[in-house]
Regions:
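Hydrophobic alpha-helical and helix-loop surface patches within well-folded domains
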Residues: 1-104
């Protein structure tokens, strides 16, 4: 959960379990990066109304992906930086195909 000036996480998100898989570790890193990016975009700056919520969430996701490709200890766990972007784009395209989506 992010707030202006503070981000809180549960212990299990920050301290990896011994039996934790690399996929779970990656997901934990993704959540941390996403929530930390909200401190700058989404908390310090915010939308006027709920219609524009997609903007702060998409920017937080973009920052998450960019951070994961720029930090050597994280990026080294992936074959190449494009893998992260392609997985991100694939998720966005699949979400856009749903009947519940609408033009922005």
């Amino acid at each position: 959960m992010e707030n202006v000036g503070a981000v809180t996480f549960t212990d299990r998100l920050l301290v990896p379990a011994d039996e934790q898989t690399s996929a779970i570790t990656r997901r934990h890193i993704e959540v941390q990066m996403h929530e930390l990016s909200h401190m700058w975009f989404g908390d310090l700056t915010t939308m006027k109304w709920w219609n524009d919520l997609w903007l702060k969430e998409s920017f937080a996701d973009f920052c998450r992906v960019t951070a994961m490709t720029e930090i050597p200890s994280i990026a080294s766990k992936y074959p190449n930086s494009e893998t992260i972007y392609l997985q991100f784009m694939d998720g966005a395209i699949n979400a856009d195909l749903k009947p519940s989506t609408h033009p922005i």
